[in-house]
Amino acid sequence: MIGENLRFALGDFWAEFRKNRAGMVGLALVILFLAAVILEPRIIPFPKAGATWHDITAWDDNPPSAPPQWINRFTEKKAAITSVVTQYEKTSEQSDSSTLVTYTFSYQDPYDVPPLDLIVHFVAAGDVPFAVSVVRPDREEVPLYQEQRQAGTREDVRVSMDRNSASALFDYLKGYESEDTLSSVDPGQLKPVQILFSVAEPGMLKHPRPLKGMYQVKLQGLLLSDASALDNPYVVFTGRVSGLLGTDNSKRDLWSGLVAGVKWALLIGVLTSFIAVAVGVVYGIVEAYFGGLVNAILQRIWEVMVNMPLLPILIVLSAVFKPSIWFLIVIMSAFFWVGPVKTVYSMALQIKEETYIEATRALGAGHGRIIFRHMVPILVPYSFASMALSVPAAVVYEATVSLLGLGDASIVTWGQILHDAFSGGAVLNGLWWWVVPPGLMIAVMGMTFSFVGFAMDTILHPKLRTR
């Protein structure tokens, strides 16, 4: 019987809820946020972004402060997009005492602005002399780097051509530029990758023209013994634009950071509002049920708490103690519970005068049974609406604390991204893709639960429908 009544009640609620356009928009956004949490590893290019966000070395292959790649649609000159090439052709040449392995990667360059860097990754073991060269579209092969690698065990090797091939490209320029031009150039200040992707002609140093077409990157390694190895190679072409939302000045992918922050925003908002509303509902019922001295004492406590400024207290406590997401949730819950108390109190005053409450008391039911079995269930629908309306405040408070640099540094939140943006000079340098998206996400998250909360409030309180 109870299950059937619940089913009909939920059916009636849904029939009313789906008529509310704002509520349906909010519900759709909630589903979208939940889908982002569930599908996070599949929809971001860096699935471990949450764990490595504060590990700057994990983002070395990205360009710093790069705009989103879709910006190319609105510019005359198309900038190179960051690309990872994992497909290769492998050849081996065996001799009596060694083996020469060659990995060839193909990269089509249709861009007007060349990549920032060309980075070669592989795993090496033992004594492995290796060399990197590039065959340009004009069929000229340019040697870039070589090294005698000695590794006792297998280790990851990363070679950046922007950092390691300046001397090789300076030698390459000698075939095209005059001695007077070269004498005025410091080899250490060259931009090797820009030269590599330019038409080979006199004047290419000062006025480079893009050389478009197919480039082939060759990685050659000489395996001197059975213990030597060179495998798992791939090449990264670090572009001038990167990802759906660009990168920050630490080369971190902002799309990955925003998606990784969704789960923390939901956790902060939902858990804080759940704890606060649960405490507030019980507090208001107890205050109304007992009345008298209990009511007077609880009323004084409520008046003290409701007049205490939460944000300054949060800032001071976060500065004194080690910032933690759980610490913030507890502190916010300790202040948010005052929100629903007065409404619950007024409703509970009416409920406790109902005939069935008097009958339950006459049958010998205890105070706890009356409160939790007969009064709390009646106020549960209101509790859900109050919870939804409390979520935006929790999200904004956390973002404010993080914006001041006092958030939990072990996770990724939108407030932290905004803090990094302001401390990194994003506004002054016009890096709008670093500031606007996290701000919009905070606003949309707040709007989402406000829509749902107001829709539920309107349905569960019929007098509000005329508002």
Segments predicted by a language model, with ranges:
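Alpha-helical transmembrane segments of integral membrane proteins
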Residues: 247-467
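Gly/Trp-centered helix-boundary motif
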Residues: 1-269, 421-439, 443-444, 451, ...
